[in-house]
Amino acid sequence: MATVMKKVDAVIVGFGWVGAIMAKELTEAGLNVVALERGPMRDTYPDGSYPQVIDELTYNIRRKLFQDLSKSTVTIRHNSSQTAVPYRQLAAFLPGTGVGGAGLHWSGVHFRVDPIELRMRSHYEERYGKNFIPKDMTIQDFGVTYDELEPFFDKAEKVFGTSGTAWTIKEQKVAQKGGNRFAPDRSDDFPLPAQKNTYSAQLFEKAALEVGYHPYNLPSANTSDSYTNPYGAQMGPCNFCGFCSGYAC
């Protein structure tokens, strides 16, 4: 017989980053919330403790933090004439499992969505004509604009402790070395300065500048200094261990 639980205001299925943030926002708004997560409980300690976390066998080979694709996966096809087949080999798309989801093993690359990406269909039709996009391609414009989302991008960067270098703030150029001149305008600076460049990054920057390109510091949700976010979570600075994507950090 099924167990009848106490009624709540909201049930969140999946307690990754999105689910966790939704639960916090709803709880602070006064709702009684329950979150359901099929994966294991994970926490900063011991799951993300250093140096235990730099274990290539556990994380890179045995894929501890990723979903078991033999049990649950998505299907993929390249066009409507093909038969969709299950995604069975992890590549660039790395779905996480357990509390924290993919946020636990995310490398921290933290670009904002470009305004063009939010109106992708219109952009390409304006540029290349109505017949450019195949009929069976589902590409669509989003129902919101960059300006509508910008305050939430700003809040997210403050929650994640994003490190970076701004190019413009409120349409005023604040260009410093390392700023991205191609980035959309922002209402506030990054909460933390950009990460220090490694030696290889310095060599790349030098070579790119010499041939006329515009290299910039990568926005990174790995804190460049000690940081306490608006939720009260304390974060230590990145220690440049190099074990990023796929490892608990």
Predicted regions and their residues:
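Conserved redox-cofactor binding core of oxidoreductases
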Residues: 60-61, 68-73, 85-92, 117, ...
